Amino acid sequence: HHHHMRVILDGVFNHCGRGFWPFHHLLENGDASPYRDWFIVKHYPLRPYPQHHEDPNYAAWWSIPSLPKLNTNNPGVRDYLLYVTRYWLDFGMDGWRLDVPAEIDDDDFWREFRRVVKDANPEAYIVGEIWHPAQRWLKGDMFDAVMNYQITGPIFNFFGSHNLNLSWHHSDVTLKTGTGAEEFRQKIEAMFELYDWEIHYAQMNMLDSHDMPRALWLLNNDKAALRLAVLCQMTMPGAPCVYYGDEIGMSAGGDPHCREAFPWQEPAWWDQDLRRFYQSVIALRKAHAALRTGDFAFLHAEGQTVAYRRRLEGEELVVVFNASNREAGIKLSTKELSASTYQVLWPEGEDKTKRAWFGRLSLELPAQSALILRAGKEEAS
């Protein structure tokens, strides 16, 4: 906190490690252990290190013996988990990221979890790892947000439409080539229809994570496409999440390769231009509240070009993308804009003004490029 950072813990409440002390007690004492009902035991003896094809005799996450599943129906387990929840918030943690919370199929537990969290810190952030649409958990009585994989596929499919690695598959993140602007618009608008707008401002928007290939790998190392995808992520409603190492050009396939250590000892390997790009777009988002909590509306979606508006309390920004590999021109109607004069905010260093004529704001964009414009004081006639 002294460094203006907030820390969110990863809470794994569905299962534990094989070294968890109540599980050790159960292994040592069997049915005589007071913790026998903390787990889902099939029969004794338990086999924490089963041989091939042997049943460990207890429920485990994905049948992995080293990850015994907790019996969250047991009052002792519930009390312990809620004690842990409160303990770390009182210690000073700022929220919880919940691992596989859908596997604890108990809304009452999560409602009580929320009450404990918000009682300790009303500003604490609760974000669940739910890959699919999560209306059940986002009604205001359980989570604040989820890891928003619903935005991941549309962003990759649009900005990587001509050069996407399709060798990775997941039922909740559909990747495909050939996605145009209109389909991108439809997917994003369908995502926005899932929840109340207050939820979207809190959603953990991500391009990749420890559970999937890195963004650059999925884009076949196309750094121009990556920059557009990141710029889109940073200008959409939500809380953008950067997976460590993406900002220096780390590229790897799925688990475990995507989890390799950050190369602290090899700074010469880092892509410093890409790192500076990340710093710039993050600074841009921080500098303009409209990009964080402004309203959102598409202005244009045609071919491989997209434009949308972010607006808040008199500030209007227009974000424009050309995802194709050739130059493209677009025209925006001033009927949906608040001004006829716009200043270029992005790319940085371009001290240019764009002016609308005859009800149209005409823009020319190079291949795989973007513009961010800020409305001037002159109002449209």
Task: Name these PLM-found stretches.
Residues 228-230:
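Conserved glycine-rich, hydrophobic/aromatic-active-site segments
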